[in-house]
């Protein structure tokens, strides 16, 4: 399912413990680490897709998490040109994503990376909230910065500002225009501080 602009609808998952640490996983047979994410099926809502991807990639069920909030609408990133398959009938140039923040309420024994026959990840660990912005593959850094910035007030309301804190300067540079990692829909000016209101409205354009 690819939209007229060439973007595939997708969901991303930030799974967070009560202390503000987030789930960070290594892709199978690769050195790259990332958050769980995956494409939406045509008959799914973003929330339905999120719970399906959560189970497929981590083995977790809805009773193992609490949904804290989501980004308002789509956040986009472009694929590097080497990853774009130009010979396909519908050319996908990137992903448009809704990102969800989940509190992990289960036990670590519930995490099962081999839940499916084709696992996405082979190793995982807990990292600081902003760590992924500086360590994910370069072309995703902008969308990670934007997603975590939207979700940070919700994370702070659970873990506290000392655990989550403000976006570090190096992570902020990925969000600002002019950065090579800024992404498809980066802002035109420095972002303003937002309040902690929960962002649950999702625009299915």
Swiss-Prot record:
CDD domains: NUDIX_Ap4A_hydrolase_plant_like (cd03671). Residues 178-205 are annotated as: Disordered. One of its GO terms (molecular function) is pyrophosphatase activity. Gene3D superfamilies: Nucleoside Triphosphate Pyrophosphohydrolase. A motif (Nudix box) lies at residues 38-59. Its EC number is 3.6.1.-. InterPro entries: NUDIX_hydrolase-like_dom_sf, NUDIX_hydrolase_CS, NUDIX_hydrolase_dom, RppH. Residues 187-196 have a biased composition (Basic residues). SUPFAM superfamilies: Nudix. Residues 6-149 form the Nudix hydrolase domain. Its cofactor is a divalent metal cation. Keywords: Hydrolase. It comes from the Bacteria. It is an enzyme of class 3 (hydrolase). Accelerates the degradation of transcripts by removing pyrophosphate from the 5'-end of triphosphorylated RNA, leading to a more labile monophosphorylated state that can stimulate subsequent ribonuclease cleavage. Belongs to the Nudix hydrolase family. RppH subfamily. This is RNA pyrophosphohydrolase. It comes from Xanthomonas axonopodis pv. citri (strain 306). The lineage of its organism: Bacteria, Pseudomonadati, Pseudomonadota, Gammaproteobacteria, Lysobacterales. The gene is rppH.
């Amino acid at each position: 399912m690819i939209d007229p602009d060439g973007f595939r609808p997708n969901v991303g998952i930030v799974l967070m413990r009560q202390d503000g640490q987030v789930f960070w996983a290594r892709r199978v047979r690769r050195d790259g680490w990332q958050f769980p994410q995956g494409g939406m099926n045509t008959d799914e809502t973003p929330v339905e897709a999120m719970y399906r991807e959560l189970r497929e990639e981590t083995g977790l069920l809805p009773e193992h998490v609490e949904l804290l909030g989501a980004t308002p609408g789509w956040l986009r990133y472009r694929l590097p040109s080497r990853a774009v398959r130009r010979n396909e009938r519908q050319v996908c140039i990137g992903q448009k994503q809704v990102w969800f923040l989940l509190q992990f309420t289960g036990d670590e024994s519930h995490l099962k990376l081999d839940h499916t026959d084709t696992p996405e990840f082979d190793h995982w660990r807990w990292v600081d909230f902003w760590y992924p912005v500086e360590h994910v593959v370069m072309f995703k850094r902008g969308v990670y910065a934007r997603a975590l910035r939207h979700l940070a007030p919700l994370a702070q309301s659970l873990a506290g500002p000392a655990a989550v804190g403000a976006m570090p300067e190096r992570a902020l540079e990925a969000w600002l225009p002019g950065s090579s990692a800024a992404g498809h829909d980066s802002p035109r000016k420095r972002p303003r501080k937002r309040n902690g209101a929960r962002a649950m409205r999702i625009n299915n354009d």
